[in-house]
């Protein structure tokens, strides 16, 4: 197994891409810690969901939160796993959780920065200032916070893999997605800069650039808009979470040891503008 003996942290791992990533890393041999702002057993989950927007409210109220279930499934594979509550915008909490992972598991080798928010599509004049600020805090600063917290542990071991979740919205733009597109473009810039810094410590830093992926969030979207986006892909269909997860396992492995600073499109060719 290509990731045997490695310890991975997946942020935003309770559903969708994060859940698929966690399971795929475990199948490849890694021990996996899942973090999310929503946990099934959290008695304050409804309050947390309300704080972080309509998508989280819907997922929490509909029972579409699987962080602890996913950890159980991973342990049933014979791997070590736990689910921890984490708000990536809280720097002190991020440092505490990453330190706990290292203490409990002995190392912290792989970081998957998947935690993000996208729950509003509005044109510029209707963009709420507080949602702009929130998206920056979660999607971009949250990624920075997690990278900074794990960096010393990876440097100490002389090995590390950081994989950041970007988006075609960050490379192509998105109508009515000024805040989301800006944060994901920022993630790509952060990825390249950290790749340069990490190389001297044998830490690779790459980004996945998903296109239209069949997740809970996608299925919540406007059906006509979803159809238009699907028809722009070369395959004329959405990808599956496992398509992202398989790319992540590759980038986390030594098969990708000479790859860094790369935005890897897993997008079905949506950026090709096929006709």
Where are these regions (language model features)?
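Alpha-helical segment proximal to the catalytic Tyr-Lys
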Residues: 152, 196-197, 257
């Amino acid at each position: 197994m290509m990731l045997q003996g490695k310890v991975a942290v997946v942020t935003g791992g309770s559903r969708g891409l994060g859940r698929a990533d966690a399971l795929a890393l475990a199948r490849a041999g890694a021990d996996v810690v899942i973090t999310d702002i929503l946990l099934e057993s959290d008695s304050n989950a409804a309050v947390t969901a309300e704080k972080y927007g309509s998508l989280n409210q819907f997922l929490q109220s509909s029972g579409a939160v699987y962080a602890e279930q996913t950890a159980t499934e991973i342990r049933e594979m014979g791997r070590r796993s736990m689910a921890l509550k984490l708000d990536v915008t809280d720097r002190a909490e991020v440092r505490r959780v990453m330190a706990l992972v290292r203490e409990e598991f002995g190392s912290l080798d792989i970081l998957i920065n998947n935690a993000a928010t996208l729950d509003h599509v509005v044109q510029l004049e209707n963009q709420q200032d507080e949602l702009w600020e929130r998206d920056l805090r979660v999607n971009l600063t949250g990624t920075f916070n997690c990278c900074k917290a794990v960096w010393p542990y990876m440097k100490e071991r002389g090995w590390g893999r950081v994989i950041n979740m970007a988006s075609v919205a960050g490379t192509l733009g998105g109508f009515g997605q000024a805040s989301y597109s800006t944060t994901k473009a920022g993630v790509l810039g952060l990825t390249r800069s950290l790749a340069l810094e990490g190389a001297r410590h044998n830490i690779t830093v790459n980004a996945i650039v998903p296109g239209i992926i069949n997740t809970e969030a996608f299925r919540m979207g406007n059906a006509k808009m979803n159809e238009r986006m699907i028809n722009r892909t070369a395959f004329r269909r959405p990808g599956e979470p496992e398509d992202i997860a398989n790319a992540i396992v590759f980038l986390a492995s030594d098969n990708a040891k000479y790859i860094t600073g790369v935005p890897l499109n897993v997008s079905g060719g949506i950026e090709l503008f096929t006709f």
